[in-house]
Amino acid sequence: MDILKKIEKYREEEQRLKWEGTFADYLEIIKENPMVAQSAHSRVFNMIKDSGIEEIDGRKKYSFFDRELFGLEESLERLVEEYFHPAAKRLDVRKRILLLMGPVSGGKSTLVTMLKKGLEAYTLTDNGAVYAIKGCPMHEDPLHLIPHHLRDDFYREYGIRIEGSLSPLNVMRLEEEYGGRIEDVKVERIFFSEDKRTGIGTFSPSDPKSQDIADLTGSIDFSTIAEYGSESDPRAYRFDGELNKANRGMMEFQEMLKCDEKFLWHLLSLTQEGNFKAGRFALISADELIVAHTNETEYRSFISNKKNEALHSRIIVMPVPYNLKVSEEERIYEKMIAESDVADVHIAPHTLKVAAMFSILTRLKEPKRSDIDLVKKMRLYDGESVEGYNSVDVEDMKKEYNDEGMSGIDPRYVINRISSTIIRKNMESINSLDVLRSLKEGLDQHPSISSEDRERYLNFISAARKEYDDIAKKEVQKAFVYSYEESAKTLMDNYLDNVEAYCNKNKLRDPLTGEEMNPDEKLMRSIEEQIGISENAKKAFREEILIRISAYARKGKRFDYNSHERLREAIQKKLFADLKDVVKITTSTKTPDEQQLKKVNEVVARLIDEHGYNSTSANELLKYVGSLLNR
């Protein structure tokens, strides 16, 4: 389907969704679907809920945020369950300004943009449909037409509560255009759009001396004031401020705390009473979610100013910290790179992971337990299993600091350094070492890093390098061991025979001489030590292997090289330890013999086919690991 056909199809769909009728027709719609009359907060909550909620380990995960926000599950759960959900149920939190507070590039703006774009799409669905009085610049709720003294009767009949009063303009239109006949008032379906300023508004502070309150509440229309003769005639007023246009939806208040105080006082009345003052009119009702964002420094100075006390209680603060999981940070970088023009550059496996490790280390706070260092903490936070620790330890660590993740290196800095590496090297391939080098060089140019932080960050780069060294060795180890797969299987079978004899207190028979002999303790320990099985734990480990073999046998399956992850790792490490010399020779010899060359080519092919390297990065990895082993 070409683009013009898609445009035509979209236009047809838009026409199909349009609806216009009288207030009487609208009442029939809400009788069938009361969701249509929901509040702004309820609409936002239902939009998030309708995208899907999954429960993982007792935590709620919202599909709505999945595409753009990574590693913020706990913050998002808190935001939805402590603000949107109770606000949708008409509880008192809906009378608060939602203030997202967090470090730069932490996802605050992305979160707000997602809510805005989400609402635009949601109002195109049946559940998110919004109807308004036709011709109203504030797209007012048609239910405001019902007089206050009849609203209790309406609630008993429809089960819908009505809040707010008809705006001055619509009061006049009702009398002049419809002769006071509410049932004849024209109602239309509207679709939220930030571009068309329908249901979504954005207010950004500028110079306090030149910025006018009219930006928020609208202004006198000088082109019609001569015609209507009075400033208090609503027809001589332009209801085009952000608060007017964001009615029924949401308004983003950018850098709210930088705003002049006179702008903030309007928000007090709007959040608490659901109305605001504009021109020479009665209070104007508005139903909108107000979202603001700021950083921690500005928030602290705002709180310390006694003049702002009345606003403090009208604000609900939601911290949006940096992500603290390596795997999720990696996804952030992948997304940012995919959106750029360098998406075709080959980035060697683990490059983004190593950059993510550095970022996360800068954001973590030193654990209070002496037996856990930052690298272990980083692994545990990422869901890796670290021997001797469990999920309870992770939860305890998370409770140690309330502000963990509110400082550290931001994702944009890392992406800038990766971009710089790609552009400077002008190559088709970059690896972890290139990026670590670039991160190190960039620290001097980072404006907000103190000399003390710089020292810490250099240590974190070294820590990330050590982690990469281990990853690189393992990667080459796997590729080499595959080439010696038969040796691995033989070693495995040999180990299992010995374990079986050990556990059953039997002897083994020598295949050549036929003599009986004791299980080979030296062989078993040389394998078990590779994965840290202590002398005291060896019996339990061997028995567990035997139980696993029996369980497989009962199901008619064969226990093989891939059946036990830790044992496979131990076999690989043992074999690699035995093969180290081969790796050293094949990677460091200037002129390898034919046999060695064949082996190197096999390993390179394996790295390319199964591990995601290209020819350049695979050869660089081999050389690097060879140099590590030669140290």
Swiss-Prot record:
Q: Which molecular function term from Gene Ontology is one that the record holds?
A: protein kinase activity
Alphabetically sorted, this entry's keywords are: ATP-binding, Hydrolase, Nucleotide-binding, Phosphoprotein, Protease, Sporulation
Highest taxon of the lineage: Bacteria
Which residues, if any, are the signal sequence?
none
Q: What is the effect of changing residue 108 to A?
A: Strong decrease in ATP binding and protease activity. Shows a strong decrease in sporulation
- Give the Phosphoserine positions (modified residues): 219
Enzyme class comes to hydrolase
Please give the residue positions where the record annotates the modification Phosphothreonine: 217
Report the main location listed first in the record. other
What modifications does the entry list under PTM / processing?
Phosphorylated by PrkC on two sites, Thr-217 and Ser-219, with the threonine being the major site of modification.
List locations, semicolon-separated.
Forespore; Spore coat
Q: List the Gene3D superfamilies.
A: P-loop containing nucleotide triphosphate hydrolases
Q: Does the keyword Ribosomal protein apply?
A: no
Which SUPFAM superfamilies does the entry link to?
P-loop containing nucleoside triphosphate hydrolases
Q: What happens when the gene is disrupted?
A: Disruption of the gene results in decreased sporulation. The mutant exhibits defects in spore formation. Disruption significantly reduces the expression of the transcriptional factor sigmaK and its downstream target genes.
Q: How is its activity regulated?
A: Hydrolase activity is regulated by phosphorylation by the Ser/Thr kinase PrkC, probably allowing fine control of sporulation. Phosphorylation by PrkC does not prevent ATP fixation but it inhibits specifically PrkA protease activity and down-regulates the sporulation processes. Hydrolase activity is inhibited by a protease inhibitor, phenylmethylsulfonyl fluoride (PMSF). Potential kinase activity requires the presence of MgCl(2) and is inhibited in the presence of MnCl(2).
Describe what upregulates or represses it. Answer: Transcriptionally regulated by sigma-E.
Similarity remark: Belongs to the PrkA family.
Its job: ATP-dependent protease that regulates sporulation. Is able to bind and hydrolyze ATP. This ATP-dependent protease activity is necessary for efficient sporulation of B.subtilis. In vitro, can hydrolyze alpha-casein, an exogenous substrate of Lon proteases, in an ATP-dependent manner. PrkA also modulates sporulation by negatively regulating the transcriptional regulator Hpr/ScoC to induce the expression of sigK. The control of sporulation mediated via the Hpr/ScoC regulator is probably indirect.
Please report the name of this protein according to its UniProt entry: ATP-dependent protease PrkA
